[in-house]
Amino acid sequence: MIVTLTFSPAIDYVVDLKHLEKGAVNRSQGEHCMSGGKGINVSIVLANLGRKSIATGFLGGFTGDYIKGELQKRGIESGFVQVEGNTRINVKLRGEEETAINGQGPHISDAQIEELMVFLETLTKEDLLVISGTVPSSLPSDIYEKILARIENQHVQLIVDATGDILLNTLKYHPLLVKPNQEELEEMFHTLIHNEEELIENAKKLLNLGASNVIVSLGGDGALLVGKGLEPLHLQAPKGKVVNTVGAGDSLVAGFIDEYVQSGNIASAFKKGIATGSASAFSEGLATREEVEALLQMMD
């Protein structure tokens, strides 16, 4: 079973404008809603690739019901804890520039955190948990570490997509995969990286601290894989026009998982991850199976 955990899901309400005039009535040229959140993105892309998952975290109110409905349409099982108040709405205004207004989100009680913990304690070594994203102010800042300590004895396979001290504090729980970008790697180790040799050297520090595999995202230059027992592997991203980078990193994680669950081969999973992340970057929405397969053929 694959489980994705999103602490602070949202509805992204995207409004297209020719021009945003402050202090005046603006007419939209179009608008649409999307279920947002890093773990939710992973579940949606997995569903697009034909892979089932359970999405969990915290949802509330009519906005939470909307997200549950959207996930259900895609065949994604909901394991969310119900909270008081409404799941947040993020407003994204797209015109000559993009302006975002992110909602605050509902209060989460200790009892609701415990309810999530009890659900996660049902996972076993056969399961894979994706834990990702920022920690909202309504949760303890060390919630990642609290969760992983609670389920440590279950030997669940872990993928952690976080940054800074949050990521560093999870490494003792030996995640299967972590996925910083170069800038995040530099910030974690208080250094500047000038070449691939230094990139590999710093990625290996994460291995030494407990990670099994590290993928360093390099934007248009693809990504670097460093893993225990593996030679470092740098793959270029396939060529294409970048339309939207939102969800591209989550899509990389989904592509990696889909192939890893299928074959157990880390290098193949890395390749599919890059293809899947690129497919999302090259489209308005999240990657589809057909888009990913086309890019994989380009990478052969």
Identify the residue ranges that each predicted region occupies.
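Conserved N-terminal subdomain of the carbohydrate kinase-like
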Residues: 48-127, 295-300
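Charged helix-capping and loop-helix junction motifs
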Residues: 114-117, 141-148, 194-200, 235-238
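Short, small-residue-enriched loops and turns at beta-alpha junctions
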Residues: 107-109, 135-139, 166-168, 187, ...
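Short beta-strands and strand-loop turn motifs
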Residues: 100-102, 126-133, 161, 179-184
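Conserved phosphate/ATP/ADP-binding segment of small-molecule kinases
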Residues: 145-230
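Glycine-rich phosphate/adenosyl-contacting loop at the front of the ribokinase-like
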Residues: 1-56, 64-66
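Conserved phosphate-binding/catalytic region of the ribokinase-like
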Residues: 168, 196-300
